[in-house]
């Protein structure tokens, strides 16, 4: 199996929740090419699934050392820092990710960062700005629905979920939220 095939297989295994086999693939990738970020990135994502946040950060550190301009890596590491409540590191990585790649997931993680740090109004305002900037991003509508629902605004939440369903009629999560 080639490097690319092992990389693809590693992510397939990760999505199937076969974390042991996926980790084996990550380690094989690292041995095949220790100068490539892919093996370390896959390992970091596996560690996130296992809630091994410190280990994931170590893996992402290695990947970032190889690819320092990869915004996705900063987003992944920022999310791990967020789960450890390492505020400064998380915010810096999420902002770096946005600066490098403007990833929608990094913006959503920044919303979570604001929420976890007690800035609910800032999180909502930021998310409203994201919805205005990219109204076709279904996940932003769903996240806003979740925030409204959590805040006890069920009717407002419903409108956000309905908007998400207009754009993605197959979205089971949004459908389930409306049915509940």
Spell out what each predicted region is.
Residues 2-38, 42-51:
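Alpha-helical segment of the N-proximal tetratricopeptide repeat
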Residues 34, 68, 101-102, 135, ...:
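Short coil turns that delineate tetratricopeptide repeat
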Residues 16-24, 50-62, 83-96, 117-129, ...:
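Structural signature of tandem alpha-helical TPR/SEL1-like repeats
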Residues 3-4, 37-38, 71-72, 104-105, ...:
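Helix-start (N-cap) detector for alpha-helical repeat units in TPR-like alpha-solenoids
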Residues 1, 143, 150-180:
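Terminal, low-structured helical/coil segments at or just beyond the last alpha-helical repeat
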């Amino acid at each position: 199996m080639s490097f690319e095939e092992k990389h693809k297989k590693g992510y397939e295994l990760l999505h199937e929740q076969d974390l042991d086999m996926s980790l084996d693939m990550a380690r094989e990738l690292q041995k095949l090419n220790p100068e490539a970020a892919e093996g370390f990135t896959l390992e970091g994502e596996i560690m996130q699934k296992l809630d091994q946040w410190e280990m994931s950060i170590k893996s992402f550190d290695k990947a970032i050392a190889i690819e320092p301009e990869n915004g996705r890596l900063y987003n992944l590491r920022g999310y791990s820092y967020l789960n450890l409540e390492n505020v400064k590191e998380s915010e810096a990585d999420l902002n770096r990710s946005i600066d490098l790649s403007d990833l929608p997931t990094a913006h959503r993680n920044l919303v979570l960062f604001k929420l976890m740090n007690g800035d609910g109004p800032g999180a909502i305002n930021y998310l409203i700005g994201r919805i205005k900037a990219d109204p076709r991003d279904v996940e932003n509508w769903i996240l806003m629905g979740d925030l409204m629902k959590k805040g006890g605004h069920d009717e407002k939440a419903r409108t956000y979920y309905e908007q998400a369903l207009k754009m993605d009629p197959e979205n089971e999560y949004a459908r389930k939220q409306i049915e509940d």
